[in-house]
Amino acid sequence: MANLQRWDGKRWVNSGVGNFIKRWDGSKWVNALVRRWNGKSWETISQQTYTKDFPVTWTRSYGGEGQYKGDWLQSNNRLYQGRYGNPDIQWEGDWGIQKSMAGFNMANLMKELEGAKIEKVELYIHNMHWWYSAGGRLSVGAHNTTNPPAKFSESRYNMAWADWRQRGGDRWVTLPKFFAEDLRDGKAKGFTLHRATQDLFYYGYFYGAGHGSKSPKLRITYTK
């Protein structure tokens, strides 16, 4: 990292960038762990690759006009996406094309990712129900709101999607690396579920915050 440099022929550059420091583990070259004594303890000064999970800390669902559905209608923090059809409209009323937002502990996430190169981003999410027994399609966007807002907002629309072939079940959904880069840089604060269509293939709901192992979380692989 900043304490370990190499000469590239023109100038001194950080050695860890690009994983230039390697060691042979008996079968392949892997990133080397380099430490130095700072007078009190050993500290790592080479780049390493880490994979960490970041659970959601809040979730909210909204109606088609962007209005907050209310805690009692969310049924214990469900994340809704899409518009349901009849007879549910007659029974429940018409909420239009529903959408959801989820956020993280941004202070912790940004501290962990500060100065990091993002390698991979995955979202764990568990479906509770699709309109069709044959499954449906999840559409993931992004937002830039720190706390749960009264109105739905979105900064990126449909940046990733994933299909289910049955009603219920969980998935790890690969998201674009720029999403974690935006989180790292404070340009995004969480993800959205939103697809601007009345197609019932997109109607479903998912476990939100407070559901233990079934709650959404990000898994980010990064080098720093």
PLM region spans:
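Enriched but not universal
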Residues: M1-Q48, R219-T223
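Extracellular/lumenal carbohydrate-interaction signature centered on repeated Trp-anchored short motifs
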Residues: W95, N108-K120, D182-D185
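Cysteine-clustered segments with highest specificity for TGF-beta superfamily mature ligands
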Residues: N77-Y84, D88, N105, K151-K224
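Extracellular structured ligand-interaction cores
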Residues: K99-M101, I118-K120, G135-R137, D170, ...
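Short, surface-exposed beta-strand/strand-loop-strand elements in extracellular ectodomains
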Residues: S133-N147
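Extended, low-complexity, turn-rich repeat/linker tracts enriched in Gly/Pro/Ser/Thr and Asp/Glu
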Residues: I125-G136, L200
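Flexible, small-residue-rich N-terminal segments that precede or flank a structured functional core
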Residues: K22, R35, W42-N108, R195, ...
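A short beta-strand element within beta-rich, extracytoplasmic domains
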Residues: F104-M106, E114-W130, L218
